[in-house]
Amino acid sequence: MENEKLLGHRRDFLKAGALLTGGLLLDQFAFAAGHSGVDDTIKIALIGCGDRGTGAAFQALSTKSNLKLVAMADAFQDRMDKSHKLLSDKFKEKVDVPADRRFIGFDAYKKAIALADVVLLATPPGFRPMHFEEAVDKGKHVFMEKPVAVDAPGIRKVLAAAEVAKKKKLNVVVGLQRRYQTNYRETMKRIQDGAIGDIVGGQVYWNSGGVWVNPRQAQQTEMEYQMRNWYYFNWLCGDHIVEQHVHNIDIANWAKNAYPVSIQGTGSRAWRTGKDYGEIYDNHAVELTYADGAVIYSLCRHFEGTANRVDETFQGTKGRTYLSANNQGILWDRTGKEIFSHPTKGNANPYQTEHDELFAAISKGEYKFWDAERGAKSCLTAIMGRYATYSGQTIKWDEALNANNSLFPDKLAWDANPKVLPDAQGLYPIPTPGKTKVI
């Protein structure tokens, strides 16, 4: 995917966060810890040892902060073994995860979280709400990948935990890394300052050739198959409008400094139609309508052999803008004159920046990041898009937020069944607009 290649004492110290100065300093011991011989190593746990989780750990361990990876958790032994070897080979002095701290299974996350000061949450996103809730309950700082949930009940759980995290002064960074990318920050700062007036419209895109697929293996139970091939099942992924296109939808909300009041649109399965592709669509086209009447058009598709486009453009009352993950950020006035262009060379990797800034704040005893609420609301925006395309209905913000259609299985076990199952031919039921009920 072309625009996504950018790849005891301390716990007690961090828990002393009740003493605040201006809402910023976590505790009175932050300075002393660095000058008194106290072990100020920040212990981190990785929850989800796939490619993205391994990448997140790589970025965390690449920061200048004094970190050590002390625990890992995953559902699958092979993913754990691969991740542990890669990280151990690269960061010999920073990885201390013996076999008894490499936890396997559906409850492995609890054991790993208990041992850390900071947790990295990077499992398939269907598990994110329960993992985030556990981390916050145990008083841990958090980096969690997007999306933070795949359905409305999950969003509500994340929003509730986000409020607790604020009260506990726990730093939370969500992996919507464009928020940490210099061209986006510089361009958005100018937009918020009124450089192109009020945003009245826009277009956001993630059009690409699709992602990996893991075909069914003979020995797999249905639960294992769906978890191995998780991208194609909504309880795990949320469909690509949620799992991937949320990046661009988040930029729409950032540009508007608001969230849509309603969404309508259409989608289908046109290219990915076989049984290996589960239940999700391969294209979505939706309109995000905001309270002031502005409409932003959102398009995402996974079609092989078609033109790729992953970027955002917005129109204001005084001009327009173009942004992309390729470090572009351009503003024009209403006559077409360029008034700002961010240099595309020499920019930091935003995947690294989000970890650099998070761990710098934690190391200094600062409370600076509360991304969870914002991340949850942009994820809800994307979920609304899926609700709209699956049902063919106009979906309003409040009804989406309060929906009770949980996608999560009633039981987590290798011999338990998820809620969506294949027919005798191995094909899964596909949402049909006008018939499918989402709320």
Q: Predicted regions span which residues?
A:
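N-terminal secretory signal peptides and thylakoid transit peptides that target proteins
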Residues: 1-21
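C-terminal helical cap and adjacent loop that interface with cofactors, partners, or active-site loops
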Residues: 7, 17, 55, 243, ...
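N-terminal Rossmann-like dinucleotide-binding module
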Residues: 16-92, 252, 437-439
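Predominantly a Rossmann-like dinucleotide-binding segment in NAD(P)-dependent oxidoreductases
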Residues: 48, 52-53, 167-174, 178-278, ...
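A structured beta-alpha segment of the ubiquitous adenosine-cofactor-binding alpha/beta core
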Residues: 90-121
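Beta-strand-loop-alpha-helix segment that lines the small-molecule cofactor/substrate pocket
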Residues: 118, 129-180, 194
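N-terminal glycine-rich "phosphate-gripper" loop used for MgATP/nucleotide binding
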Residues: 123-126
